[in-house]
Amino acid sequence: MQGKIIESLAGFYYVESDGQIYQTRARGNFRKKGHKPYVGDEVDFSAKENSEGYILAIHERKNSLVRPPIVNIDQAVVIISAKEPDFNHNLLDRFLILLEHRKISPIIYLSKTDLLEDLDEFKKVQKQYQKIGYYFVYYLEDLTPLLKDKITVFMGQTGVGKTTLLNTLAPDLALETNEISDSLGRGRHTTRAVTLYNIYGGKIADTPGFSSLDYEITSSEELNAAFPELLKLSAACKFRSCTHTHEPGCAVKLALAQRKIWEKRYQTYLQILSEIENRRETYKKVLKRK
């Protein structure tokens, strides 16, 4: 039989096949090979009626996220709050960079707009991200049509309203939520496992919240590729290995001077580039000590 893993919990993998859910375990050979099944995996499995089944094979994956562990994702809704916690340009860009690097299409959803007096400021932000090529929405009626026939991950900083949004989309789920802590300005984690839910003709994952992001990006070339607007311009740079910082004939620096690209995004690029270089220098020092 073939199916898709829709939930992983306490060593069990729940596989959906032909409208039925089967409780399965992974064969021991997966552990020996270090090839663990994840939510989103297409698998071959065996199962008898009213008995526990076993995963026999895992199909090739098209992409993956490490944290949360989920694979074969079509798109990700990055939920960023307008307030409580306050809107964070830098954090949003870091989510987008992660998704670009992982070849997952992002959708930006602005939550908690009811706490704003007006949306004028964010309409300007929306235009900037739309100019890059991203969906940027803050109404459910704009989001729901984008979910059909897709596997969609919901992700964002803790406390931005992921679970609340899912409960609005599908009240029958009744997922647990918690309010923001006044002292910390962040929410408590309420999502304990990665689970795929059937909603609006697609599958949606509510994932554990994040306070920080880990990257596999280790070079300026990889970072450049994670910024669509910089990648497009970099073909016109004088030097192929241009870092868009000090090199002559840099098309990105020219576009920045002409205000054709958003300076806030460029500043995020410079910050992360500096972090990459600092990690590289730290690694070199460690190697010298050895």
Curated annotation (Swiss-Prot):
Q: Which gene encodes it?
A: rsgA
Note the InterPro entries from the entry: G_CP_dom (IPR030378), NA-bd_OB-fold (IPR012340), P-loop_NTPase (IPR027417), Ribosome_biogen_GTPase_RsgA (IPR004881), RsgA_GTPase_dom (IPR010914), RsgA_N (IPR031944)
What does the cofactor field's note say?
Answer: Binds 1 zinc ion per subunit.
- According to the UniProt entry, what is the EC number of this protein? 3.6.1.-
GO process terms (BP): ribosomal small subunit biogenesis
Q: How does it assemble?
A: Monomer. Associates with 30S ribosomal subunit, binds 16S rRNA.
* Purpose: One of several proteins that assist in the late maturation steps of the functional core of the 30S ribosomal subunit. Helps release RbfA from mature subunits. May play a role in the assembly of ribosomal proteins into the subunit. Circularly permuted GTPase that catalyzes slow GTP hydrolysis, GTPase activity is stimulated by the 30S ribosomal subunit.
What protein name does the entry list?
Answer: Small ribosomal subunit biogenesis GTPase RsgA
Subcellular localization(s) per the UniProt record: Cytoplasm
Q: Which residues bind GTP?
A: S111, K112, T113, D114, G156, Q157, T158, G159, V160, G161, K162, T163, T164
Instruction: Family membership, please give it.
Output: Belongs to the TRAFAC class YlqF/YawG GTPase family. RsgA subfamily.
Q: Which GO terms describe its molecular function?
A: GTP binding; GTPase activity; metal ion binding; rRNA binding
Q: Cross-referenced PANTHER family, in alphabetical order?
A: SMALL RIBOSOMAL SUBUNIT BIOGENESIS GTPASE RSGA, SMALL RIBOSOMAL SUBUNIT BIOGENESIS GTPASE RSGA 1, MITOCHONDRIAL-RELATED
Q: Which organism is it from?
A: Streptococcus mutans serotype c (strain ATCC 700610 / UA159)
- Any one Pfam family here would be RsgA_GTPase
- Name its co-factor(s): Zn(2+)
The CP-type G domain extends over 62-213
Q: Name one GO cellular component term.
A: cytoplasm
Q: Which residues bind Zn(2+)?
A: C237, C242, H244, C250
CDD domains named in the record: S1_YloQ_GTPase, YjeQ_EngC
Keywords, A to Z, come to:
Cytoplasm, GTP-binding, Hydrolase, Metal-binding, Nucleotide-binding, Ribosome biogenesis, RNA-binding, rRNA-binding, Zinc
Matching SUPFAM superfamilies:
Nucleic acid-binding proteins (SSF50249), P-loop containing nucleoside triphosphate hydrolases (SSF52540)
> Where does the signal peptide begin and end?
none
